[in-house]
From Swiss-Prot:
It comes from Methanococcus maripaludis (strain C6 / ATCC BAA-1332). It comes from the Archaea. The keyword DNA repair does not apply. Signal peptide: none annotated. PANTHER family: HISTIDINE BIOSYNTHESIS BIFUNCTIONAL PROTEIN, HISTIDINE BIOSYNTHESIS BIFUNCTIONAL PROTEIN HISIE. GO terms for biological process: L-histidine biosynthetic process. Keywords: Amino-acid biosynthesis, ATP-binding, Cytoplasm, Histidine biosynthesis, Hydrolase, Nucleotide-binding. Pathway: Amino-acid biosynthesis; L-histidine biosynthesis; L-histidine from 5-phospho-alpha-D-ribose 1-diphosphate: step 2/9. Pfam families: PRA-PH. The gene is hisE. This is Phosphoribosyl-ATP pyrophosphatase. The lineage of its organism: Archaea, Methanobacteriati, Methanobacteriota, Methanomada group, Methanococci. One of its GO terms (cellular component) is cytoplasm.
């Protein structure tokens, strides 16, 4: 299984099951509007960190912060009810 698909699947499961101690469950359990706002703040924060790492030309930090950005974007997508398959289909459309 593709590692990104596996992470996405885990995120979806944790949103549904809300296991105790799960970061994803904690981030997504408020009412939907509040949860989405919190997730959007994290996406913005992580995007800024990627930009700063890129400006510093710090490859290791770019990779680390990009993983955080992609993760939090996946949480936002999953919380919004978007499946991995829907996202994959959008990428396929753009490969023309």
């Amino acid at each position: 299984m593709n590692v990104l698909k596996e992470v996405y699947s885990t995120i979806e499961k944790r949103i549904q099951e809300k296991p105790e101690g799960s970061y994803v469950a904690k981030l997504t359990t408020d009412d939907k509007k509040t949860a989405v706002n919190k997730i959007c703040e994290k996406v913005g924060e992580e995007a800024a960190e990627v930009i700063l790492a890129a400006k510093d030309n710090d490859k290791a930090e770019i990779i680390y912060e990009s993983a955080d950005l992609i993760f939090h974007t996946m949480v936002l997508l999953a919380k919004s009810g978007i499946t991995y398959e829907e996202l994959s289909e959008e990428f396929k459309k753009r490969m023309k």
